Amino acid sequence: MKYIIIGLGNYGSVLAEELSALGHEVIGVDTNERRVDVLKDKIATSFIIDATDEQSLSVLPLKDVDVVIVAIGENFGASI
């Protein structure tokens, strides 16, 4: 399966690594460059974008994935 995980903090990063280790294609998204850098060699693709900005989200292949997981925990409003 193909996943997009938005938010690569504690939960999102572990989930991304585990899904990738199971053979799934994982696209990771976060605003924090350091978080993206840590995972860039462990997952298929990564983006440094603000997922709360609709225009930024347009670069993601949303129509080509099976599941999108929003793992933003710091700001409840951003996860909606």
Regions found by a protein language model. Give the residues of each.
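Cytosolic regulatory regions of ion transport systems
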Residues: M1-I80
